[in-house]
Each structure stands twice: as C-alpha cells, then as structure tokens.
Amino acid sequence: WSKNFIEKPNEYLGNVPVCPYAAKARQDNALKVLEVTKDYNLIDKIVEGTELIKDSKTDIVIVACSDIHITVEELNILIHGYNVVFVPQDIYLMASHPYDDEEDEPVEFLETDDWEPDNEFLMVLIQNFDKLERASDMMRKKGYYDKWPLDYYDGTVNKRKSYRRYRH
C-alpha cells in the first residue's frame, strides 16, 4: 500500500506523493504495522501502538484491521477519546475507515485506478503529535495542501489542530 500508492508521485498533487514522508519512514524501518484480524483485538492493538510510537526510531505505527464490524462513527468516537488521553503525551491518532464518505467533494488524490488493496481494512495511524505538527507546517509552507478539498483539509489537518489545546 505504501510503496504502490502512498509513496508514488500523485498527479492531483502536482506529482508529489500523497505522503512525502512515507518512503523514508519505510526505508528507515521507522514504520511499524500491527495487523488485527479479529475486531475484538483492535483496542489492545491501538494501545500497543501508542507504546511503540514512544520509540524514537519509530515515526508511525499503523494499526490495520480487516475485520470491520465497527462503524465509521464508532471508530471516530473511539479515536477522539484516545486523543484526549494521548495528545498530552505527544501521541496523535488518526482513523481511516473504508466506509467513511464524510467529504462533500471527491478526494481525487486518494483514488486510483492503478492499484487496489487485496481486502478492505480500517486503519489507525499513530504518530508523535509535535513532530507531525512541524512536518505539516513545513508542507503547508510549500503549498502541499493547496490542492486538497477544503472539507478534507478540515477533517484531517484542522481536526488535528483542534487537539492542540490538550497538548500544552
């Protein structure tokens, strides 16, 4: 998924990868993936991921769950609760659910005809909050977000920024 989609230049973003930091994180072994095959293990794996991200050599932990019985709303509520607890500890969690169609505008840079995953899965991405904020600010200054639909920007970047009040 990372090599075949996230790291490749994306025409909708001016041939910049969807995540400009993904290739380096993967190549440096700074990416950890925790697979969940039974949804009742999801909460424990997320907590395990919050421990793994504390390692200074880890940039991102992805908890991927293929047993999707949790709804988009339930996942978002769960992750919000975790963020209230973990953002003060410099840990940020972001949910990605395959059935989430929150955006009013299509997010073309997240759609591809070239590659499809073998199965559907939800993800929880876990990163250091301050490091993510700095990287996001650098990308903003370079114009990276200029091509993002406004509602997608609000649901990702502005949503993360709303947790700043818990950090300091």
Which sequence ranges carry the predicted segments?
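Expand to "…catalyze enediolate/carbanion chemistry for C-C bond making/breaking, isomerization
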Residues: 1-168
